[in-house]
Amino acid sequence: MMMTKQKNSLAERLNIGEEVRELKLGATFNPKNTSTAFHTIKYDFKPASVDTSRMASVDVGSNNQVTVTVPNSESSGVPHTVYKGNQREYAKECLMIYDKETGAITIEKLNHNIQVKKTRNEVANKSVQLPGQNASVNMGQGQLHSQGANGSVPGPISAPGHSTGTAPKMENSTMRISTKTKVSTGSRRNNIIDFKPRNSPMQQSSPSRAVPVHRSPQSAPAWDANNAQQTLPSIPLITDDDDFGLRAALHNSGHANTSGSSTGSATGQPDFGSTSSSSHMGKQRQAPPHGHGKRQQMQQRLSPPMAQQQQPSNYGRGYNGGHNHVQQQQQRNSPQQQRPPAYGHGNSMPMDLDSTREHELTSQSVAQAAAALEQQIGGALSASSSSSESDSSDSDSGSDSDDSTEDDRPTQGQQQDHQQQQQQQVYQNHNHQQQQIAQQHLNQLPNLGLGSISPAYGSNHQHQQQMAPHQQQQKQQSGIYASNGGFPNDLLQNDLQLSSNSSDDDDE
């Protein structure tokens, strides 16, 4: 029944009656046939604009490539449609041809089966789209050339015959390329700006040079150098604390050199390494000779006449004590004159303050020594007056003692002059040594900009040299007893008179 239905449908469709017809074999079944061939073409898409009144063309190329060109109607605006595909041979397929006029049916063999697809490189589309494509490609090339990037331009150029369907894709691809190149070139520009101070040889002529200059850490000290407060800590400062530290060091060295100062004062040469502490210790050592001489004088007045013959040796001890006292007073002044070179490395103000303090200490020590000697002189005068009253009853012995004292006065004056000359020589030698040591200190000082320090030192040294004779004059004015072991000339004469009287009594 299905066959009848199919036949009925086929007979109805072909308008063939139910009658039996003869089937003829075509020329394709003839082996000698070379001019007739039947092919089937299968299209994927057939536009409605195809003009069936005109002939189409089929072009078979190498490798079984087939190009089919179908003409289109003039109203479509496109002259023809091009199909391309491949072909393959048939083996068992046949074609039946029905002739409506004669009613004959002919069967033919099929040669090739061709399957084609519509291409998008039509001539009309090609002529219309090429200006736009070229413009877009040129724009893309211009952007790439201006921005310095390499784009894949040969892709759109290699397909110049595409249809309108690829135009948006090509434009989109061009836009993608341009946007990508913009992003990439933007990042490259930033990288060039960042790396230009390191690698670029034209970094001086680049207008973006100012940006890395502010970022560079090497330019930071240039900004900090304008601020004076930040550079001050790098300059070494010498303050009053440093002066006190030097003073403490000199004080410790004075304790260490106490023995040296005592030996120097005993030999008549001042010790310049000693300080005020050694001078105070020298005062303590000075006191026993005076006290010892005073006790011996009191014992001489109370002792028998034979024991009074040892009195000149006691006066010699007193002279030695006075000479040591003068040398120790000069030794007190020597640290003052040595101190300015030590303080020459610092500021000049502490040097002046120390000189005034030392001057005050020296004046106080001189005043104390003068008061102690005056007390000793007063005690000695009272003792001598009592002894002179007890011995004044003997006139003969007094006349003899006058002769003896008159004989002794010239010798005493010569001794005093000789002692004064020795003191002046010692003082001159002391000043000469001080000048030499000061000159050595000036020569040994490093060249640290001492132009501002040396005038202060010179003025202070000159002031001390002027003060030294003044102090020496005060010492001489404080009492004539300083050169004679701490006793005045009258007291010495009275004591010598008493000793001569006692010697006369022994002779009688």
From Swiss-Prot:
Q: Where is this region: Disordered?
A: 140-226, 251-508
Q: Where in the cell is it found?
A: Nucleus
Q: Where is the composition biased (Polar residues)?
A: 140-150, 161-190, 272-281, 296-313
Which is an annotated Pfam family here? EAF
Q: Which residues form a coiled coil?
A: none
Q: Which InterPro entries match?
A: EAF_fam (IPR027093), Tscrpt_elong_fac_Eaf_N (IPR019194)
Claim: Transcription regulation is one of the keywords in the record: yes
Asked whether the UniProt record includes NAD among its keywords, one would answer no
Q: Where is the composition biased (Acidic residues)?
A: 391-406
Tell me which Gene Ontology terms the entry assigns under biological process: positive regulation of DNA-templated transcription; transcription elongation by RNA polymerase II
Regions of biased composition (Low complexity) lie at: 251-268, 314-341, 412-444, 461-477, 489-502
Keywords, in A-Z order: Activator, Developmental protein, Nucleus, Phosphoprotein, Transcription, Transcription regulation
Q: Name one GO cellular component term.
A: super elongation complex
Enumerate the transmembrane spans: none
| Gene Ontology terms for molecular function | transcription elongation factor activity
Modified residue annotations for Phosphoserine: 200
Q: What family name appears in the similarity comment?
A: Belongs to the EAF family.
Q: Which function does this protein serve? A: Promotes transcriptional elongation by Su(Tpl)/ELL. Essential for development.
Q: What is this protein called?
A: Ell-associated factor Eaf
| Source organism of the structure | Drosophila erecta (Fruit fly)
